[in-house]
Amino acid sequence: MASLTYDLTLAGLSVGSAAALTGIGLIVTHRATGVLNFAHGAVAMVCAFLLRQFTVEWGWPLALGTAVTLLVVAPAIGVALERLVFRPLAVLGGDPAQTLVASIGVFVLLVGGAALVWGTGARADAPTVVSADPWGQLAVALALAAGVGAVLRSPRGRPLGSRRRTRFATELRAVVDDRPLAVLGGIDADRVAAAGWAFGSFTAGLSGVLLAPYVRLDPYGMPLLVMEVMAVAVAARMRSLPVAVVVALGVAVGQSQLTRLHPAGRAEPLLQAVGANLFVLALLVSALVLPGVGTRDALPRTATARVPTPPGAWIVAVVLFLLPLGFAGSDLHTSVQVPALGVVLLSLVVVTGRGGQISLGQAAYAGLGALFTALLAAGRFPGLPRLPELAALAVAVLLVAPLGVLTGWPAIRRHGLALALATFAVGVGVSRFVFAQPYATSGLSLGRPAGFGGDRAYYVLELGLLTAALLAANALRRGRTGRALAALRDHEPGASAAGVRVPALKLAAFVAGAALAALGGGMLGMGLRAFDATAYDPVRGLLWFAAVVVLGADSVLGALAAAALLVGLDAGARGGVAAVLVGVLAVLVGRFPGGPYEALRTAASHLRLRREVSLTPLGSRVRRRLLPRATPPAARPSPRSGTPSPAAVPAPRSGRGRTAPTAPGSGRSDTTPPGPHIRPGTAPPPSPRTRQGAAPRPSPRTRQGAAASSPPGGRPGAAAASGHRTGTGAVSAPPAGAEPRAPLSMSLRALGLRVAYGGFTALDGVDLDVRPGRVTAVVGPNGAGKSTLFHCLAGTLRPSGGRVLLGGRDITRLPAHARTRLGIARTFQQLAVFPSLTVDENVLVGAEQGRTADPEAAERALRLLGLDGPVRAFPAAGLPTGTLRRVELARALAGSPRVLLLDEPAAGLDTPEVTTLARVLRALAADGTALLVVEHDLDLVADLAHTVHVMVAGRIVASGPADRVLERGYGG
């Protein structure tokens, strides 16, 4: 018994050493570049194949082949990846989630390339670099960990590191944290990143050549095996090398020891599955239970950008999908797979494209759909009778859909890298613990529904199911649900602030995605007449994800094109061509966010000849003489709308001293929206651009007097909302029923709020009362706790002590979206608009998700903020800052809030825009809304606020009327 334990321990140490090397490589790459390298396993596989090629095929000496592979080829792969793929993303400011998509593309590219060069079969003659004695491999792993630890040791601890090493560690950390700032500081960021990638690829190659003699060496199996070992790096929080080594050795030894247990009964297959896949179980635990890695990273906008559909594309798609009805033989049999795979990829359009959630486990749901359909049709599903094939497919979809919670639950608190790991872990777990188990899948065959046994008849059935799936996906992407999903994708905090139930919506997206994937998987299984576990392995899931992303994740047409591309290339070309093509496109997705069509259109626009027309000197003199007599450009009406021509409208300023472009076709200057001071039948005040000179900002005392002179009973907000601009800029009478509804008066109170971060106290017993009909301002220096207080009131931060009351109700534990539905709206210091939605749709999200479901609320908000013109039809992306500030405020007002919280509302606005903003906010207060403003612009505070609170070091040190508090020198 002791001898068996010793032998199993040695076997575990051998596997654990290779796993430790993988963890070390992943951690080093992540610490050096900030990238979680999903291609690590693919690099290991390529190096193992190259060493075999050098020594077995070409007859090189083992020492020479090993040296070339590990010291030349592996680092060269890392440097090439850094130079060609990840450096451009870093220079362009790509976020970690964007580099994640690129690393998945590299994985798919290398796997496909290896399949092209060496074929898809497994090799059993890989050379042994280190003897089977585990002590040699363990020594390699420990020596490598010690060397890396010495290089990466922080400057505070120098016993093992020289000055050069500590300086390199500092430079490495600086490049990862802020590459542009590191470059400005004189650090050679390219050299540091290249060194990190070279070393990471070296460790990947070392892991590959050590594992190759003992595992299955093939283009698909070995990369997946190495990626399963990613659990050790995740458990070490991508930071601690000792933890990674200990976890790797412990899991490997435990996995080896489990092989000695052989219980009787039903527990035996389960225990065997756990014993063979303990690293997979560790990956599931570390990805689903431990705190997420990179939780702040969302899926990049380039991966989910709205892709323009080429003219006539749908007609072409319909024709192409009908063509197989004229095929016969093997061509028709192959075509049967296209509609089924199209349905599977539609699930990614819903989850990733529209919902913005990274999902690498959709292949698992497709496989479960096929497996459950086969079990139900065969009468082998526990507790259910044998069902006809179509009924079995429907029941399988209903059974798999709730399992979408397996990936939807982690998505509630995880984003980007953490969510990618969680969904990938679920996919690997299902593949290993369900699909690979003979007790669940042995002897399964899957027939086709009665009357659809032939390929042509079954293809017709598939087209009907595909049409139903397209309608379902389109319904999820349109209307109220579609707008909420787009808001969640574009800006999750903004969506929550608008009232979107983010957790429930994420779960709904993953459940719908699981249902679609199960439907497609069942169709695919019936088309092939069998359940093939390899058709749903995690590597194929990565390929599907990459294909959908590169062809337009938010495009239904892109999913259909991806299905046709993958099936066509797999059937008509050598294995691996589809993976290579998709991998190349995925690597380039950061540069061409709209997919191949957008890239081709951009290239065509650059190649198109542009003829520039210039006037001669005589023509210039004639123009100068005639120009004063011509009609001013701003007065020319647009031929369609009668509003001033968009090209002639002066560009408004988006910030202090900066001019931003006006949205084309907006029909008005961004600096002169109708303000609440305008009464029906009166002309608006002259634009600052029409005056001889811009008037200076009035003093705080003058502003207070001007504000006080406005009669509170005049309801300026009602006047502003009840009138609308005509084409000439005048304000006409409102349509019937356009009167705004005053919100029910309700105050927001903070009682003894306390927030501490470690040993730092951000809020220390803060009391605050935001009363209806009044503007309350909070000022103070940076770090005083203003933003922390704001987040506690908005619901994005839970205080460690104290309470938040709304009209006497304790809302301290309520999340942001729940507070929005109670009547608390907010804006953000950094703009929180939804770029893929139009101005109208942005505001409509607030009206649909806010406190009251009032269909006219969006229209009133648009009219109040001067957004009811042509600009309402334009996407928010690219609009000037001033316009976007109004869009954000209009969205908040569309929910009919009782309390409005504004965080730096004047950020990025010029003087006329700030003046207009103050008019609107005063009107809202006059209508009974309670306003809280956190602002550094003391002139705006003096002009606007009734009460000012000054915060210093987490406490309110002064309170009172604005003129008295500000004239005493507080606030700055």
Summary of predicted features, one role per range:
Residues G802-R809, L822:
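Conserved ABC transporter NBD signature motif
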Residues L900-E904:
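Catalytic Walker B motif of ABC-type/P-loop ATPase nucleotide-binding domains
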Residues V941-D943:
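A short, surface-exposed alpha-helical micro-motif characterized by mixed small hydrophobic
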Residues A794:
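Helix-to-loop junction immediately C-terminal to a conserved catalytic motif
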